[in-house]
């Protein structure tokens, strides 16, 4: 909550996850970022929008993909650890993923305001999690043909 007692304003995020890893996440309704680190997940709040950008099919040496592969809404923002076996206990948050179509990034680059340097656009994703403006989030999810609940967007995208 804000200091004035109001609710948190919804934020919009892009997480960077290989396609093979996010397929596990969508199946289990969770996301883990930056090799299971806790810190990036602390930025999420219930109701935030989340997009997944997959630079590769699989990590670390999979074929290049460069596509948005999943979209959803952060469920509670509560961080917990999952058990992936062999002692790997990554931190996660639950996500309500929505039906979407995988969408390549390249046709969208010129329209995305968070990508300032269009020729070196990949640099925008180097930290594994970035907050983006609602308009960019809506543009990408529109290209993915995602349907968010009524009232999700403060400024709904034009139909």
Q: At which residue positions do the language-model features occur?
A:
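Compositionally biased, charged N-terminal/linker segments
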Residues: 1-46, 144-149, 153-159
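Hydrophobic beta-strand signal
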Residues: 51-52, 69
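Aromatic- and Lys/Arg-enriched surface recognition patch
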Residues: 64-130, 134-135
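Short, conserved, surface-exposed binding loops centered on an aromatic residue
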Residues: 41-45, 61-66
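Short, charged beta-turn/beta-strand-edge "cap" motif at the junction between a beta-strand
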Residues: 54-60
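C-terminal terminal-subdomain/extension
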Residues: 119-157
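Beta-strand-rich binding-surface signature
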Residues: 12, 49, 92
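Short, intrinsically disordered low-complexity segments
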Residues: 46-49, 58
């Amino acid at each position: 909550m804000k200091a004035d007692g109001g609710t948190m304003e919804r934020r919009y995020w892009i997480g960077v996850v290989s396609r093979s890893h996010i397929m596990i996440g969508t199946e289990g309704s969770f996301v883990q970022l930056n090799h299971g680190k806790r810190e990036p997940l602390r930025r999420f709040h219930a109701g935030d929008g989340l997009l997944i950008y997959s630079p590769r099919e699989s990590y670390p040496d999979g074929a290049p993909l460069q596509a948005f592969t999943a979209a959803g809404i952060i469920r509670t923002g509560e961080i917990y650890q999952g058990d992936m076996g062999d002692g790997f206990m990554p931190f996660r948050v639950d996500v309500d993923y929505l039906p979407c179509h995988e969408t390549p990034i390249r046709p969208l680059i010129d329209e995305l305001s968070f990508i300032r340097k269009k020729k070196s656009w990949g640099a925008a994703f180097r930290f594994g999690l970035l907050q983006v403006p609602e308009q960019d989030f809506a543009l990408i999810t529109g290209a993915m043909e995602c349907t968010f609940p009524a009232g999700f967007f403060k400024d709904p995208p034009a139909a």
